[in-house]
């Protein structure tokens, strides 16, 4: 009897439950996958959005919407008046920022709303556009797919290929808040009817544009950051006279498989010295000249070692020239000598530019491929 009464109560409760209420149809939802911002000539914020379209009657798979506003929060209301459907938050994949905007202002203040709303996606990738943001957003993608998906896949595949960095919105915020490192962002540009990852954008401590790195320099940046999640590809032009070959054939390509770094920092009479010793294990991917590897492998190791040091030294000097620290050297200084770090914390970029940085790699070839 008790079981029967309990069953009746359960069925009565189920009958009174209203369920999910009004049905939600995907055709009426608008998922914003890409935000893009730049400043116009009047210093107004121009915002572009790419949202997916699921209607069977639509000819395009996504819609680009443009608004001119003072703040990103204000753009939400204007978007709602232009997009037919409900704007669903939490699906953002990419945030594009015009380089011209970074050259004028700290963009973090404009992105403030994205950090405050818990519904927003803070794992979206932050990308700098070298050129017109409008050109990128209105590029024809009929043979490539939906714009938001194309940008996300391009950025993540180039990072996996280790020729650019990958900075999420959350990571960008952390870099901006940490005085021991300066931000580095993926850089992209439009070439004819293609989107190309051209390298990495470096920012000052105040969030303004400092300089750009090409793809080779971006790979070296990952080495100096000790970011070894995947093999890092590098191609070097080695001294032709050492290997008795022509200049146009004196190339070798490698993958850095492992790297173990030892950082030491010291202050002497207020002058900072950073010593970096790095053991690097590589595999030979390409060699365009003849060489007896059994007898001359050490010669090749030394040549690659010297070229790696030369290019890393040039990259460090480039960062020092612009008073930026995308490598995170400041993190090591802070952890090893906190007392002296507090003296330079507020002007770390300038302090690094005046410091002596010694980079000493030790290269070992662990694989030469099946052809040897």
Please state what every model-predicted region is.
Residues 2-372:
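Membrane-proximal alpha-helical signals and transmembrane carboxylates
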